[in-house]
From Swiss-Prot:
Subcellular location: Cytoplasm
UniProt free text on domains: Has 3 domains, the large (RuvB-L) and small ATPase (RuvB-S) domains and the C-terminal head (RuvB-H) domain. The head domain binds DNA, while the ATPase domains jointly bind ATP, ADP or are empty depending on the state of the subunit in the translocation cycle. During a single DNA translocation step the structure of each domain remains the same, but their relative positions change.
Source organism of the structure: Legionella pneumophila subsp. pneumophila (strain Philadelphia 1 / ATCC 33152 / DSM 7513)
Protein name, per record: Holliday junction branch migration complex subunit RuvB
Record SUPFAM superfamilies: P-loop containing nucleoside triphosphate hydrolases (SSF52540), Winged helix' DNA-binding domain (SSF46785)
GO MF assignments: ATP binding; ATP hydrolysis activity; four-way junction DNA binding; four-way junction helicase activity
Length: 336
């Protein structure tokens, strides 16, 4: 099973991109949640605009689906400049990054998603570009190779990553502003769902929006996806208005429970509790019990369960917590 196959996946899906752009906020005043990040960025942006300088290079990191791309677009909009978007895996050759950099205008924003996947060769080119706005690349090979030095207009590089630990120290140290995005509160997600519903023309009661928010795993991308599915259900099974009852019925049909768990989350937890007496149990045994690959369990299923306190990862194996027992209505077994 792939992460993108799940309804509650926080990964981006190509078919949703156009709709996501339609409901994406364009200014910090519309950007719900991440209050500390918003207030800091507002000050940095205002200061840069007063000086007519480019904003310092910005690194944004955090789990997928929390709005890193949205924040990058907001920064460019607030600065009143253009944004050029690309991603780490796409930039394969020195000529690729050179073409992008030489086409930037003064104070423009270059946004690189998945920046941790840049090759070392590309990183080496970025260092002088970020520090001195100079491009130094080699053209040709062997005896015919020659170095070309170009002046670049001042610009802002915004890098986004879900895995900040994979960034090399020299690259990470060149970002003057580093922002971490956290999972959203239910109140913030409720505001996001209500705003998206309004923009999509979906009549939604406040309680209906909150019910969707409760099951969205702290992630706006999931909240907006669930909103679209609940909208479909309400139009077919109801009168098109999303009430709390309609949201509950739709999400129960979609097998997304009150904690945002789907069938695979529940299957994993129940396997640990029922098959292995709550653990500790090794990852290979869990994989065999639920018929999933070890990598899928470690990368797709476990992180949210651990983050929410339903599962513990210990040197002896995985252990279901008392919170997991309570979720399924079991009495917790005393762990040694």
């Amino acid at each position: 099973m792939l992460e993108s196959d799940r309804l509650i996946s926080s990964q981006s899906i190509v078919s949703e991109d156009a709709m996501d752009r339609a409901i994406r906020p364009l200014s910090l005043s519309e950007y719900v949640g991440q209050d500390s990040v918003s207030s800091q960025m507002q000050i940095f942006i205002n200061a840069a605009r007063k000086r007519n300088d480019p904003l310092d290079h910005v690194l944004i990191f955090g789990p997928p689906g929390l709005g890193k791309t949205t924040l990058a677009n907001i920064i460019a909009h607030e600065m009143g400049v253009n944004i050029r978007q690309t991603s780490g895996p796409v930039i394969e050759r020195a000529g690729d990054i050179a073409a992008i950099l030489t086409n930037l205008q003064q104070n423009d924003v270059l946004f690189i998603d998945e920046i941790h996947r840049l090759s070392p060769v590309i990183e080496e080119i970025l260092y002088p570009a970020m520090e001195d706005y100079k491009l130094d690349i080699m053209i040709g090979e062997g005896p015919a190779a020659r170095s070309i030095k170009l002046e670049l207009p001042p610009f802002t590089l915004i890098g986004a990553t879900t895995r900040a630990g994979l960034l090399t120290s020299p690259l990470r140290d060149r970002f003057g502003i580093v922002q971490r995005l956290e999972y959203y509160s239910v109140d913030s997600l409720t505001q996001i769902v209500a705003r998206s519903a309004h923009l999509l023309g979906v009549p939604t009661k406040p309680e209906g929006a909150r019910e969707i928010a409760l099951r969205s795993r702290g992630t706006p991308r999931i909240a907006n996806r669930l909103l679209r599915r609940v909208r479909d259900y309400s139009e077919v099974k109801g009168n098109g208005i999303i009430t709390v009852d309609m949201a509950q019925q739709a999400l129960e049909m979609l097998e997304v429970d009150q904690h945002g768990f789907d069938l695979m989350d529940r299957k994993l937890l129940l396997a640990v509790i029922e098959h292995f007496n709550g653990g500790p149990v090794g990852i290979d045994s869990i994989a065999a019990a639920i018929g999933e690959e070890k990598g899928t369990i470690e990368d797709v299923l476990e992180p949210f369960l651990i983050q929410q306190g339903f599962l513990m990862r210990t040197p002896r194996g995985r252990i279901a917590t008392s919170k997991a027992y309570q979720h399924f209505g079991f009495s917790a077994i005393e762990q040694e």
